[in-house]
Amino acid sequence: YVRLCMPKAKIAIHQTWAYEQDSHRLNIELGYKNHTDMFEDVRASYEKAAKDIKVDFIIPSGEVFQRLIESGIEKVHRDTFHASYGLGRYALGLLWYSILSGNDVKQNTFCDFDEEISKTEIEKAKECVAELCSI
């Protein structure tokens, strides 16, 4: 319907992320041994969905979380599965801003967070988003 009514519109899907390492949901409810295995399944599912429904691009939110976690920053969840009010939401906001506007996030000065975020975490989030958006 969107393509019929707005043929020039770009259609995207928002990729979700893996649950927090060692959480009940991840290990018991879903049976994963670690968040990396879950993320690999999430990524594959979104790639398949994108192809099946012919979207123009994926907003790689799960990829941002995964990169932050792999860099040693693990405070991206607030309750083992939702984005934290601080770093998680900030990283997602940077990603959406960069993807939708085409602007570089490295000079972004936003700093009104719902939870405290260290300067190191702010810079790491910007770095992860900038790397993803340059691919």
What do the PLM-derived regions correspond to, one by one?
Residues Y1-G86, S98:
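Alpha-helical cap/lid subdomain in secreted, periplasmic
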Residues V76, T80-L87, A91-I135:
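Conserved catalytic region of serine esterases and O-acyltransferases that act on ester linkages
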